[in-house]
């Protein structure tokens, strides 16, 4: 079985607040890419629970965060539809995203 790694490096200030976020995915040809935020969700099937890592740098502006969330929610709507086939719910989610963007 082939394995692949995605590495995320977080630089923290003295108060453990993220100052820099860099990621590498060598299989995709990406090395030391800078990012201002990362949201990771993992599913624990045994516990039937989501595990999350939500980080953003202190330099990220509120308007950037709103755009980031809007784009993330839109992508989640598409992923939800592909994963479940539930077009109606995905459309409801997209309508919320339109409202969110206003």
Give the positions of each predicted feature.
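Short, charged/polar N-terminal "headpieces" of proteins
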Residues: 1-32
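Generic structural hydrophobic/aromatic packing signal, biased to beta-strands
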Residues: 8-10, 21, 38-42, 76, ...
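Surface-exposed beta-strand edges and their flanking turn/coil or helix-capping segments
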Residues: 21-23, 32-38, 66-68
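Acidic, aromatic-enriched beta-alpha/helix-loop junctions
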Residues: 27-58
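Alpha-helix boundary/N-cap detector
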Residues: 30, 60, 64-67, 71, ...
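Cysteine/selenocysteine-centered motifs that mediate thiol-based redox chemistry or coordinate metal-sulfur cofactors
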Residues: 46-82
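C-terminal charged interaction modules
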Residues: 78-102
């Amino acid at each position: 079985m082939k394995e692949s790694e995605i590495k995320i490096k977080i630089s923290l200030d003295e108060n453990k607040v993220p100052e820099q976020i860099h990621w590498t995915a060598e299989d995709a040809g990406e090395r030391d890419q800078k990012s201002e935020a990362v949201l990771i969700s993992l599913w624990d099937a045994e516990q039937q629970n989501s595990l999350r890592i939500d980080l953003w740098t202190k330099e990220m502006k509120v308007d950037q965060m709103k755009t980031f969330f809007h784009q993330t929610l839109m992508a989640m709507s598409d992923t939800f539809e592909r994963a479940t086939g539930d077009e109606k719910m995905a459309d409801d989610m997209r309508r919320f995203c339109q409202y969110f963007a206003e």
